[in-house]
Amino acid sequence: MKNKVVVVGSYNTDMTIKTKKLPGPGETVIGGYFSTGGGGKGANQAIAAARIGAEVCFVARVGNDVLGSEGIKRLNEEHINTKYIYRDNELPTGVAFIVVDDKGENSIVVASGANANLSPTDIESASDEISSADILLIQLESPIESVYASIKSAHDNGVTVILNPAPAQELDNHILKYVDIITPNIVEAEMLTGIKVTDVNSLQSIVNRFFDYGINDVIITLGSKGYFAGAHDAMKIIPALNVAPIDTTGAGDVFSGSPAAFLSEGMTIETP
């Protein structure tokens, strides 16, 4: 039997242009290849977990429009349960405009659209799915009151909660105290703890601060250097594989979705 992961988060239609260099303020550059596809942190993480083999249910909100229908179709093709993807009659499906340079770096602007209307009532409607999951994976592209409702529901039912605190924003301890595992990047870790990353000792201090918040395990992503894994019994850097980047869009999302699947199978955060 597959282990179950519920992802609560965003779905966006990504519109991507590839170009030699990212434009600066007031600058126009000529792009090349253009494509559209599914995206959003929640959707990316759900797909990553499903492709690894987890049974995934995705809770989200899309517009009652063509882009929303296409998104649900894409997710169904990935064998993701879309029963709790709600259609919104007020706002359109979220859209992300992405520019990618020839080094694989990107700049992104997001119009949240229907993602902004995901409500605690939506979360309550999906409570049976959440309570029966092994893992709840959530990000911060949804309204904070819905993030709280999801995390609290999972915690109250003994479900392991993984929070990917992106996009970076300050969070109160009334949310963090219900989180089991947190997966920030350096910017997010610094914002949530007030500790500047300078070396391994500062990473250890950040992990200890998260422990003070009540979080059990910490995964701090370090870009090309890998990630720093912090548990109560061990802390260490897990190095990244040396690969040539093509497009870094969604890389952090895939990283968060993958551990959700592996942890649901009983692996630990120190497993490379």
Give each language-model segment a name.
Residues 1-62, 66-80, 245-246:
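Glycine-rich phosphate/adenosyl-contacting loop at the front of the ribokinase-like
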Residues 2-5, 169-174, 200-272:
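Conserved phosphate-binding/catalytic region of the ribokinase-like
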Residues 47, 95-99, 226-230:
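Short beta-strand scaffold segments in enzyme catalytic cores
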Residues 50, 76, 155-156, 211:
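Anion (oxyanion) recognition and catalysis
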Residues 78-90:
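A glycine-rich helix N-cap at a beta->alpha junction
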Residues 87-88, 98-135, 140:
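Conserved phosphate-binding/catalytic loop of the ribokinase/pfkB sugar-kinase fold
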Residues 135-205, 224-227:
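Conserved beta-alpha-beta core of the PfkB/ribokinase-like small-molecule kinase fold
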